[in-house]
Swiss-Prot record:
Gene that encodes the chain: dsbD
EC annotation from Swiss-Prot or TrEMBL: 1.8.1.8
Predominant localisation class: membrane
Signal peptide limits: 1-22
Domain Thioredoxin: 416-567
Record's protein name: Thiol:disulfide interchange protein DsbD
Positions of transmembrane segments: 172-192, 215-235, 250-270, 294-314, 332-352, 364-384, 392-412, 418-438
Pfam family membership, one: DsbD_TM
Enzyme class: oxidoreductase
Catalysed reaction, written as an equation: [protein]-dithiol + NAD(+) = [protein]-disulfide + NADH + H(+); [protein]-dithiol + NADP(+) = [protein]-disulfide + NADPH + H(+)
GO biological process: cell redox homeostasis; cytochrome complex assembly
Keyword list, A-Z: Cell inner membrane, Cell membrane, Cytochrome c-type biogenesis, Disulfide bond, Electron transport, Membrane, NAD, Oxidoreductase, Redox-active center, Signal, Transmembrane, Transmembrane helix, Transport
Membrane topology field: Multi-pass membrane protein
Higher taxonomy: Bacteria, Pseudomonadati, Pseudomonadota, Gammaproteobacteria, Alteromonadales
InterPro entries assigned to the protein according to its UniProt record, in alphabetical order: Cyt_c_assmbl_TM_dom, DsbD_gamma, DsbDN, DsbDN_sf, Thiol_diS_interchange_DbsD, Thioredoxin-like_sf, Thioredoxin_CS, Thioredoxin_domain
Length: 568
């Protein structure tokens, strides 16, 4: 029964992993009645000049954030050295991957070059709202003659709604995921067969009753958990200093290669573990501890966390890289603590039941190990897809899902009965088909929606298109740095019912990614707060502000919005 459950869970996990991202965006639409702040209200800028030191700060409104990689000082020769960016928190979205952002309040200091003779410098920054609006790149000039006219930057009251960088809700999901992964690691062939021996070592000569077993097993797990948690703390604290570098293409490639190597280890291509000499010394010290007492059992658990088996070394290394990239010390400790608790659950169950609640060791454990290998390989693809065209990443994912399904199906064909074989293979085939379809459909929708619009590049082009049309004109303002703009293209404009309504409109689009003089003129002329923004012009050529769309709108709501305009 356990074997069937594990293999079916593996297949369903593959299906969920590819269906959930597409569903979540469409099932959680942002309402259009959001009242967005102006850029200066969302990001209250302040500066102070003290001799050669300049300090700039932003008070960031709740549910808004600034991008770390958008911070820049112009001209660059005004700086004495490359300024160190303040620590931020990790932010992930479907289109741009992992970024470092600032919420609530951020302060940035840098030193001026003594040889710089200019009177002013310019600070550039850019941010977005959680509700789906991104502001154009913003510039603020700072006078360097004596002291800045602005007031000194002071920290506001602490309004942080989350203790953890990845957010409380996301942290809970992450902890549950790593707890489940810990349970999965416990069923790998290097770990699971050791539980009978380990249970005997933990109990020592103590009387074997459920109270002693539960208590000592818990102490052992705590020793292992604290060791892992300390590893997470060390790695996260180191990652905090280098968060910005984790977004560099070279670093992403290196990380992708590392995860691929970890995956090969789980496939049995080579053995990844501590040097034998280190293991011998740790095991020798562990052997000197006596089971059956709290201190001895705790030390044995702590040492077992260091002597990682070949089956756990690769996933543990992958978890450490994940924590290093987040740079969040608190969540780093919590994640590895959850992972180790998951690994300890089977030990506690084994001790309490004498092994009756757990399956017998067998070939099915290799399936679990291989499943972890495919999960690590998926991380490799997630990392490199940020650096390659969508068309290429689409085919890589298709190849991945098919190969993973075939590989797992072949692996489970031996240890399972014929009924379970058929069920599991069907589930794996469904996972591969679903994943492949989603990737192909995603690429096709992006191309399809993007080709609907006539491209305009300045105010004159817009005015000409509006003047020549005898229908309603819809002007879509787009930029590559706008996450919600991409959501519009992929999930809203690609909808068949929306496209049916498009027949009543002339569609034009202005790409303001570069934020050059022409782009700024467009945004200024039409008083655009941020992106995405969609303007509507009636057949007489007048812009109708009451129909303007600011921020993301899902397909159903946008279709109704178009119907309302046409029915006028």
């Amino acid at each position: 029964m356990i074997q069937r459950f594990i293999t079916c869970l593996a297949a369903l996990t593959l299906v969920f992993a590819v269906v959930a991202p597409a569903h979540s965006v469409q099932s959680n639409p942002f309402q259009q009645d959001n009242q967005f702040l102006s850029v200066d209200q969302a990001f209250d800028f302040d500066s102070e000049v003290n001799d050669s030191k300049v300090t700039v700060s932003w008070v960031v409104a709740p549910e808004y954030y600034l991008y770390q990689h958008r911070f820049k000082v112009v001209p660059e020769n005004a700086l004495a050295a490359e300024p160190e960016l303040p620590q931020g928190e990790s932010h992930n979205d479907e289109f741009f991957g992992e970024s470092i952002v600032y919420r609530n309040y951020v302060e940035w200091s840098f030193t001026l070059n003594p040889e710089f003779s200019g009177d002013t410098i310019t600070v550039q920054y850019q941010g977005c709202a959680d509700a789906g609006l991104c502001y154009p790149p913003t510039e603020k000039q700072i006078k360097l003659s004596s002291t800045s006219e602005t007031a000194p930057a002071t920290a506001p009251p602490n309004t942080d709604s989350s203790l953890f960088g990845i957010g409380e809700q996301h942290l809970i999901i992450t902890l549950l995921l790593f707890f489940a992964l810990g349970i999965g690691l416990a069923f790998t062939p290097c770990v699971f067969p050791m539980y009978p021996i380990l249970s005997g070592v933990v109990l020592g000569n103590r009387e074997r009753n459920w109270k002693n077993t539960l208590w000592l097993s818990f102490i052992y797990v705590q020793g292992m958990a604290i060791t892992y948690s300390l590893l997470g703390l060390v790695v996260a604290s180191a990652g905090m200093q280098y968060q910005a570098y984790f977004q560099h293409p070279v670093v992403l490639i290196v990380l992708a290669v590392l995860f691929a190597l970890f995956a090969l280890s789980m496939f049995g291509a080579y053995t990844l573990q501590l040097p034998i000499s280190w293991q011998s010394k740790l095991q020798s010290f562990s052997g000197q501890q006596s089971g059956g007492n709290i201190v001895g059992v705790f030390i044995i658990g702590a040492i077992s966390g260091l002597v990682a088996s070949p089956c756990t070394t690769a996933p543990l290394s992958g978890a450490l890289l994940f924590i290093a990239q987040s740079g969040d010390m608190v969540s780093g400790v919590a994640i590895l603590y959850a992972l180790s608790l998951g690994m300890g659950v089977p030990l506690i169950l084994f001790g309490l039941s004498g092994g009756k609640l757990l399956p017998k060791a067998g070939a099915w454990m290799n399936v679990v190990k291989q499943f972890f290998g495919w999960l690590l390989l998926a991380v490799t693809l997630f990392l490199i897809e940020r650096l390659i065209p969508t068309s290429i990443s689409m085919w890589l994912w298709i190849f991945y899902f098919i190969l993973a399904a075939v590989s797992l199906a072949v692996s489970i064909s031996q240890p399972l009965r014929i009924t379970t074989k058929v069920i599991t293979i069907v589930l794996l085939a469904a996972a591969a088909t679903t994943g492949s379809y989603w990737q192909v459909n995603k690429a096709q929708l992006e191309q399809k929606s993007h080709g609907l619009f006539t491209v305009v590049s300045n105010v004159s082009d817009i005015q000409q298109q509006v003047a020549e049309s005898d229908r309603w004109v819809m002007l879509d303002l787009y930029a590559d740095w706008c996450v919600a703009c991409k959501e519009f293209e992929q999930y809203t404009f690609s909808d068949e019912q929306v496209q049916a309504q498009f027949q009543e409109f002339k569609l034009i689009q202005a790409d303001v990614t570069r934020n050059n003089a022409q782009d700024v003129e467009i945004l200024s002329r039409y008083k655009v707060l941020g992106l995405p923004t969609i303007l509507f012009f009636d057949p007489e050529g007048n812009e109708r502000p009451e129909y303007r769309v600011t921020g993301y709108m899902n397909a159903e709501d946008f279709k109704k919005h178009l119907e309302k305009i046409v029915s006028e």
